[in-house]
Amino acid sequence: MIVTDEKNRYVNKNIKTIVEKKALLDMDMVFERYPYEIFPFDFDTYFASPQTCELVVTNCETGRAEYLDDRENKERLLAIGRASSSMPIACPMVEIDGNEYVDGGVADSIPIIRSLKTGHRKNVIILTRNFGYRKKEGTRGWELYVAAFRKYPNLVRALVNRAK
């Protein structure tokens, strides 16, 4: 989905807005205005579907991936989506069921093992880097992670070791 209308864009360009919302991305736009107003989401069809749709989130307390879904509650489903999209530092953590979560890519960038364990024999993985690319290991940025997430040492560990 490409949004060309400036008033419906989800990237915060105004420094004041970034500071106030503590986010580079307007997550309220994406998870409140888009599904209810701008690009209406058919929750009834989604909830009635027999297909499973797990979203990967990273538990900030444990630093581990969790695979969540909701088939009844719109707000909880959108909270799971928001958490799954909340890039550390760029977006705030999201609380679900009393736990804080961020983007699932921190703990499980490509959840192929989960997919295989849940019975999916065929998987499509779309690479967004050149063939052979490997993320460099290192602790670059760890000071920022420690400062931002000092209450969550397991999340810091997951962020620093993400390339492994």
For the regions a language model picked out, list residue spans one by one.
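Detector for methionine-enriched segments
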Residues: 1, 27-29, 87, 93
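Non-catalytic peripheral regions of patatin-like phospholipases
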Residues: 3-41, 48-50, 58-74, 105-164
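Short linear motifs in intrinsically disordered
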Residues: 41-49, 81-86
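Short, structured loop/turn "capping" segments at alpha-beta junctions
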Residues: 45, 88-92, 124-125
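Short, proline-enriched alpha-helix->beta-strand connector loops that line the catalytic pocket
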Residues: 49-53, 96
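Short beta-strand scaffold segments in enzyme catalytic cores
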Residues: 53-58, 92
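ATP/pyrophosphate-binding catalytic subdomain of soluble kinases
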Residues: 79-114
